[in-house]
Amino acid sequence: MIRQRVQIMVSGKPWNITAFYPLTRYHVKEIIDTLYSIHCNRDDLCKAYKNLTGNQMNNGLTFSNYILRETVTVFARSTCPEQYFNLIVHELHHLSVHIALANDFDLAGEEVCYINGDIAQAMYPVCKQLIV
């Protein structure tokens, strides 16, 4: 499993992202501990645990703490490179929406698109190795 930490600037303030990929059941505790560290509530931790231990392919999750400006995103294993790319784009969309909502940005506005691009650019060095 790869753990990637990236930071983007949003409205002049940092937003920290921890990404895990590709998930296996051996890494569930580390991911749950990371979610707990950003104050993921009990219900969401239980949902995340079920998601992470379900051994599902083409699956992910994204949780953000808007106050701490921290996100944990997880990309499970996938059935093929195209599906893995789809999974990454899907979870990055959730992440961009979380950041937009935390900053009162218009979801239809350009700012959200730039945020999505900043995230993609920051995560590219790892993602490019996994989409082959």
Feature-to-residue mapping (PLM):
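Generic hydrophobic, helix-prone segments enriched in Leu/Val/Ile
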Residues: 16-20, 95-100, 119, 123
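Short, solvent-exposed segments of well-ordered alpha helices
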Residues: 79, 83, 104-107
